[in-house]
A protein has these predicted regions:
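Redox-cofactor-proximal catalytic regions of oxidoreductases
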Residues: 39-64
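A short small-residue
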Residues: 62-66, 326-328
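Flavin (primarily FAD) cofactor-binding/catalytic cores of flavoenzymes
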Residues: 2-13, 18-37, 41-43, 72-369
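A short acidic, helix-capping loop that chelates divalent metal ions and anchors anionic groups
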Residues: 66-72
Length: 369
C-alpha cells in the first residue's frame, strides 16, 4: 500500500474541521480534510425536517465569514449545510469526500491514517469528528413491545413516520422539546426527562441579541486557562445531563398540550415505566437521548476509563501532534457549539504552527551537526 505524506490531516469536515482548515490555510500549511460524507453539511441535512439551530444566525458564524442571514434568524438545517458549503468554497479548503478513516496509529515520527486502501502519513492529526458519533439508547429499549414504533432523534424526520396514538419522547433537552412541538399537532405527546431550565426572553429583541453577544464573547474568553473559566466549565460538566432550552420555553410546551412526565426508569411487560412507577401505554417512542463517543478507530492510548480523550484544550500532550476539536467543554462553555469552533480551531492551529517550527529547528540542528 502506497503511503502519501501530508503535513497535517484533519479528520472530519463539519464546522470544527472547516474552522481548523481556515486557520491552517492562513498559515499556508500543507493539509487536507478527510470527510466520510459526500458533501459538506450532510450531518445537518439528515436531521428532522423542521430542525432549526437553537441559537440565532448572529451567533453562528465561523471565522472569516458571518452567517448570511438577519442576526435574529434561526437558520434551518439546510441553511446551515449550505453555509458550510459556501464557507469551504470561499476559502478553497482542500477536502476529500467519501473517505471514512478506519484506523489511526503512530509509527516512528508520523501518524498513519488508514482509510480503505488509502494510507497517509502526517506529522499532525486533528480529530474533528466531535464526541457525539454514535446514537445512544438505553439497553432496555429492546424490551419494548415490538409493535411500538421507535426512532432515535437522528433518524426522525417528520410526523408521518409515526403510528396513530400517543408518543413518548425520552429526553427533555433542546432536541426532545423541538420534536415534541413538531409532533404535538397530530399526537398526544409525553416528554420524559428532568427540567433542564431555559434561557428566558426573546432572541428577537435588541437587548437579548446584545446580551447573547456579550455572553458569547465572555464564554470564548473565559477558557479553562482562566480561574473563572475553569470554575464555570467544572460546574457545567457536573450539570451536563441536559442543556438549557433556548428557542422553546416551558410555556410553548404547555400551550402545545405537551405533557411533562418524569424520567424513564425501564420497561415492564413491553411498556415504558417512569421513575414514579407509572406504566405508559404509547404507540411510539422517540429517543432524544443523545450520542456517545466512538473513537474505537483511534489505536492510541489517549483515552480515560470512560473513553474520553485526555487532553488540554484539545492538545494531547502524551501524543505530540495529535489534537481533538469539538468536544464538550473542550476549552469553554461553547466549545461544542458552532459559535465556539473558531477559538478552539485557532488555538490548535497556532499550536501546530509552533510545533512545526520546533520540528524544523530540530531538523536543521541535526543536519548541521
Amino acid at each position: 500500500m502506497k503511503t502519501e505524506r501530508i503535513n497535517t490531516v484533519v479528520i472530519g469536515g463539519g464546522q470544527t474541521g472547516l474552522a481548523t482548515g481556515y486557520y491552517l490555510s492562513q498559515q499556508k500549511r500543507d493539509f487536507v480534510i478527510l470527510d466520510a460524507q459526500e458533501r459538506f453539511g450532510e450531518s445537518w441535512r439528515k436531521r428532522w425536517d423542521s430542525l432549526r439551530l437553537f441559537t440565532p444566525a448572529g451567533l453562528n458564524g465561523l471565522p472569516g465569514m458571518t452567517f448570511p442571514a438577519p442576526s435574529e434568524h434561526f437558520p434551518t438545517k439546510d441553511e446551515m449545510a449550505g453555509y458550510l458549503e459556501t464557507y469551504a468554497a470561499r476559502f478553497e479548503l482542500p477536502v476529500r469526500f467519501g473517505v471514512r478513516v478506519d484506523e489511526l496509529t503512530h509509527e516512528d515520527e508520523h501518524y498513519l491514517i488508514t482509510a480503505g486502501l488509502q494510507r497517509s502519513a502526517a506529522e499532525h492529526v486533528v480529530v474533528a469528528t466531535g464526541a457525539y458519533a454514535t446514537p445512544w439508547v438505553p439497553a432496555f429499549a429492546g424490551e419494548l413491545d415490538p409493535a411500538t414504533t421507535q426512532y432515535h432523534s437522528v433518524s426522525y424526520r417528520n410526523p408521518s413516520q409515526l403510528r396513530r396514538g400517543d408518543v413518548l419522547i425520552v429526553g427533555a433537552g433542546n432536541s426532545g422539546a423541538e420534536i415534541a412541538l413538531d409532533l404535538a399537532p397530530n399526537h398526544q405527546v409525553l416528554l420524559a426527562g428532568r427540567d433542564t431550565g431555559h434561557v428566558p426572553g426573546s432572541f428577537g429583541s435588541f437587548g437579548y441579541q446584545a446580551g447573547g453577544r456579550v455572553f458569547l464573547e465572555l464564554a470564548k474568553r473565559l477558557t479553562i486557562d482562566t480561574l473563572l473559566g475553569r470554575w464555570l466549565v467544572t460546574k457545567a460538566r457536573a450539570f451536563h445531563g441536559g442543556h438549557l432550552l433556548v428557542r422553546v420555553s416551558p410555556k410553548d410546551l404547555t400551550e402545545a398540550d405537551v405533557q411533562r412526565v418524569p424520567r424513564l426508569a425501564g420497561v415492564r411487560d413491553g411498556q415504558p415505566v417512569l421513575e414514579d412507577g407509572r406504566v405508559l401505554d404509547v404507540s411510539n417512542v422517540v429517543w432524544a437521548t443523545g450520542f456517545r463517543n466512538d473513537f474505537r478507530w483511534i489505536r492510541l492510548p489517549v483515552f480515560d476509563a470512560q473513553g474520553n480523550p485526555i487532553h488540554h484544550r484539545g492538545v494531547v500532550e502524551t501524543e505530540p501532534g495529535l489534537y481533538f476539536i469539538g468536544l464538550p467543554f473542550q476549552s469553554s462553555l461553547v466549545s461544542s457549539q458552532v459559535a465556539g469552533a473558531g477559538i478552539d480551531a485557532k488555538y490548535i492551529a497556532d499550536h501546530i504552527a509552533s510545533r512545526a517550527r520546533e520540528l524544523s529547528f530540530r531538523l536543521k540542528e541535526g543536519l548541521a551537526s
